[in-house]
Amino acid sequence: MSELQVLLESFHQTYHQQDAGQLACYIPELCKADPNWFAISIVTTDGQTFQVGNCQQTFTIQSISKVFVYGMALADHGQDALLAKVGVEPTGDPFNSLIRLDEDSKRPDNPMINAGAIATTSLIRGNGPTDRLNRLLEMFRRYVGHEVFIDMPVFMSERDTGHRNRAIAHLMLNFGMIDKNIDEALDLYFQQCSVLVNCHDLAVMAATLAHKGINPITQERAVESGYVKDILSVMYTCGMYDFAGEWAYKVGLPAKSGVSGGIMAVVPNRAGIAVFSPLLDEYGNSIRGRRVLEALSQKLGLHLFDLSMGGCGLQAAMDSN
């Protein structure tokens, strides 16, 4: 057994005993999650997998979807055109903030907050709602390596209770940030958040970004390599919401969280890491996930600015027996 596998099992045992946090019960379907679910998965850019826990337990991708839809919008419109519509500035505000709408620039601050994500989703090209949804599902398929499906009860739950997101969309319509067809954009946004994945899927998706846009399992390209830099930059500065600064300081990896309990992190050129545990902190991030990734970064020297290690601890742990 490799040192990395031993390390993951040790972290799983240690952090599974910690039960702080709350389920995301403002979405009724997410309140049904088992607080004991806990999984850690690492997929390397050469296709190796190291994992422990409930790695096959499915959950909805939620806000982690914003990363991949942003990449799709980049491919549809190009960097300059998309930047004119959605900024890349961190906010320091909660993900569902109503107030971070830049009236001067006529664009939301970044694509990782809900306002920016709704605007980004509204820009996805297609011949009507069904075509746009099919394009999104095909994009997710390339990242994951297999067909993906929407959890319809979660989608309906989000659509029925997503009044705050509707308020955000109407504010953006008022400021001229999105076009008038906001119900269609919101439905597509709720659908993308309701795509089912598991912890291993998330690790493969993160590893695809680490591997310059090529899925390390299927060898299929999911996104052009030129856009990966843009995606990872926004993940690094904005992916963990109002915890993004402390995350960059302590963990030092591009990452994205979702309120269903997933967190994925990218170790460029090396691996994708995913942790799933539905108990959340006050920022909407998985508490166990945050702690595992902090511990992995420190133990293996994964911080992008840890010049003494340069991520070599990960390779050493993989190679040991």
UniProtKB/Swiss-Prot annotation:
UniProt: substrate binding residues: S63, N114, E158, N165, Y189, Y241, V259
Domain of life: Bacteria
Coiled coil: none
Pfam families noted in UniProt: Glutaminase (PF04960)
Name of the protein: Glutaminase
Family: Belongs to the glutaminase family.
Oligomer and partners: Homotetramer.
Record's catalysed reaction(s): L-glutamine + H2O = L-glutamate + NH4(+)
Example GO molecular function: glutaminase activity
InterPro entries associated with the record: Beta-lactam/transpept-like (IPR012338), Glutaminase (IPR015868)
Alphabetical GO biological process terms: glutamate biosynthetic process; glutamine catabolic process
The enzyme's E.C. designation: 3.5.1.2
Swiss-Prot/TrEMBL keywords: Hydrolase
